[in-house]
Amino acid sequence: MIRKAFVMQVNADAHEEYQRRHNPIWPELESVLKAHGAHHYAIYLDKERNLLFATVEIESEERWNAIASTDVCQRWWKHMRDVMPANPDNSPVSAELKEVFYLA
């Protein structure tokens, strides 16, 4: 399993809306994530800085990256772009984080 972590931003006035849209997440998006080998996906909110910290375990980078081209992912990005900064393709602006410590 490959552990990944990344950080995103959420608009200051959209914390509750961001959480509402994820609870529950669309069943078809959950299915696509699982079918592409995503496990233990969690997102945490830092309210003070409007930051989202996400962690996920994946089976392969190729399968993880393929999620972006699915119809449901494209629709999800459009659904979320009004509550967080987005790239021109509607994907959330994000930065991958380097793991510097892990205790199993």
Swiss-Prot record:
Task: Classify the source by domain of life.
Answer: Bacteria
Q: Which residues bind substrate?
A: Y18, Y41, W76, W77
Molecular function (GO) terms listed? L-rhamnose mutarotase activity
Catalytic residues per the record?
H22 (proton donor)
Q: Pathway membership of this protein?
A: Carbohydrate metabolism; L-rhamnose metabolism
Report the HAMAP family cross-referenced here. Answer: L_rham_rotase (MF_01663)
What is the designated name of this protein? L-rhamnose mutarotase
Phylogenetic classification of the source organism: Bacteria, Pseudomonadati, Pseudomonadota, Gammaproteobacteria, Enterobacterales
Q: Which gene encodes it?
A: rhaM
